[in-house]
């Protein structure tokens, strides 16, 4: 990370400070309730979060953010160093096999416009300096590249219910989700903690299918001299994204290492004992694959976090620069695409500020 920020970085930093100040002054609480009812007190040690925010809630544990928690997170950013946690997506990028391929196609181009002349405003006698434009049409899955899973992403049971009891028979649709879609994920500003498990093990990346245990979490915290607090965004580094390169087209290598991840026991530790508000990693699925023998589902961590606890999952977060600089605590900021019906925020560019 550059020690001296460019003018653009400084301007961006000042903008973020201004936004955070506005956030605090507005006393905006995501649950729509007062500070007391939406405070971290709603989390219960030993139980975690769960369906505690009311029968119409679509936000989950992110309700715990308050102006006070945002202000506290902003105070971590004392150096002004901005870390880009997003990865570049292209039509060749690696993705989980359960998601559709994508295409990025030129829709309009200066040469095409000149030949087609299908708009009056580009006729030569009107468009005398030959102004042209580029635009693209995208066919893309809503779970690719850097992501934050929405609470409607995963369903459970014969009734196909998701977080807070919303059911497919009531709230599914031909044009995406009608409850808990990605538009319900609020802007996230929180204390972030990176747990460098690859660093703990002294390897570039964890072995394929490595299961990150509660013991690993405690060992990393001790090694990094880091503490977890209720309301944290917790991100695990496996080292997988060191192989992403320019656009994630090194599919065979990524597919191999993308299988390392956390166990259900680790997820429960973070939620029920530490109060994690969002849990993520540098892989496509956060949890170890395949699921441990005896698991009732192929993705037990997703089921527990999204459906049972209402805790969003961050995926494909680029953590290599944070690991290089040994930055384990930071202010985490992320916003998602406000596309109605989508099941996740995708191709995101969250940032960590220290």
Which sequence ranges carry the predicted segments?
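Active-/binding-site microenvironments in catalytic and ligand-binding cores
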Residues: 29-354
